């Protein structure tokens, strides 16, 4: 698989997360942003949102859990693959990450690390679905994030 997503993250680890059209417009105009996480939209608008990002030369990652009108089943990943030019998906659901990998999309497993049980769940899911990246939230946990980095 092409490694441009990994290269983009390595070159500039600051990733823009857009939640509305105003954020999208600003993000697309910034040259130093290479990867964009799409955290909004609906089944009718996601194609155009992704296209704006792609037209600005950036990597487009769709958070499929946050797109209105789409289900939480694996078919949502097929929909994104078939109907947009998205480079990959973000999800909190391991089954969707697994489907994204099957479709040769880049994947980010988003995880809320709230306690030791959640930490163990990350270990299990990471081994089962092998996402390209794991996004740990909340992002104010440097020691725990360091541990997650070492295990992956």
Label for each model-derived stretch:
Residues 2, 40-56, 69-74, 91-105, ...:
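Active-site-adjacent beta->alpha loops and helix N-cap segments on the catalytic face
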Residues 17-29, 73-79, 117-127:
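Short, acidic/polar
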């Amino acid at each position: 698989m092409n490694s441009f997503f990994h290269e983009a993250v390595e070159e500039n680890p600051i990733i823009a997360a857009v939640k509305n059209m105003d954020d999208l417009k600003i993000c697309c105009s910034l040259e130093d942003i290479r990867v964009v996480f799409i955290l909004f939209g609906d089944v009718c608008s996601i194609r155009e949102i992704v296209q704006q990002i792609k037209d600005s030369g950036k990597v487009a990652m769709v958070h499929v859990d946050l797109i209105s009108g789409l289900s939480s089943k694996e078919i949502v990943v097929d929909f994104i693959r078939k109907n947009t030019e998205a480079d990959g998906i973000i999800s909190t659901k391991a089954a969707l990450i697994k489907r994204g990998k099957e479709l040769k999309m880049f994947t980010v497993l988003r995880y809320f690390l709230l306690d030791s049980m959640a930490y163990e769940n990350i270990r299990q899911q990471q081994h089962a679905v092998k996402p390209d990246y794991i996004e740990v939230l909340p992002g104010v946990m440097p020691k725990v994030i360091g541990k997650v980095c070492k295990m992956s």
